[in-house]
């Protein structure tokens, strides 16, 4: 079970997994359809190492408002690091549409080396509806 599973079961919180509020640092790029109203980031250690480096799981949980005119359904995401490196999301949850004018919580989870989980990131989300334009959220940091 990853962080998404913990979140879905209500087990992801400050007691066991370090978390951090992103409300003051997170911003959507101009021209986006989705506006975050609340956001938190999480970090969880795994028992794994790769090449002698500790592997961690990171999650971003956002309450997103669709201020567009059509539904927006998450399809995938990447986390873009400070040097432009990208980590494909292990998953985006839930894969349900956000109706125009409505809010929905969206969770994105990635896995990376502990050393790479430092700095300020951009979260890039794209929709099932296509259109080619990704939703970009700047100022993502992790505890």
Regions found by a protein language model. Give the residues of each.
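Short, solvent-exposed beta-strand/turn "edge" segments of beta-rich domains on protein surfaces
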Residues: 38-55, 97
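Short, hydrophobic/aromatic beta-strand segments
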Residues: 59, 70-77, 118-122, 135-136
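A eukaryote-biased signal for short, well-structured alpha-helical docking elements
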Residues: 1-31
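Asparagine-centered strand-capping/turn motif at beta-strand->loop junctions
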Residues: 63-68
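Extended low-complexity, serine/threonine- and proline-enriched intrinsically disordered segments
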Residues: 75-85
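Activation corresponds to long, low-complexity, non-globular regions
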Residues: 8-10, 38-43, 58, 70-73
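Short, solvent-exposed, Trp/other aromatic-anchored flexible loops in extracytoplasmic proteins
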Residues: 86-136, 143
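Extracytoplasmic
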Residues: 31, 57-59
């Amino acid at each position: 079970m990853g962080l998404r599973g913990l979140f879905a079961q209500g087990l992801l919180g400050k007691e066991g997994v370090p978390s951090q509020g992103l409300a003051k640092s997170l911003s959507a790029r101009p021209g986006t359809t989705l506006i975050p109203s609340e956001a938190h980031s999480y970090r969880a250690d795994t028992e794994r190492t790769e090449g002698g480096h500790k592997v961690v799981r990171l999650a971003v949980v956002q309450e997103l408002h669709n201020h567009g005119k059509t539904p927006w359904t998450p399809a995938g995401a990447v986390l873009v690091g400070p040097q432009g490196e990208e980590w494909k999301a292990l998953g985006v949850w839930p894969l349900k549409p956000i109706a125009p004018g409505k809010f929905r919580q969206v969770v994105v989870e990635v896995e990376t080396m502990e050393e790479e989980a430092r700095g300020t990131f951009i979260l890039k989300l794209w929709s099932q509806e296509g259109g080619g334009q990704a939703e970009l959220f700047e100022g993502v940091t992790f505890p």
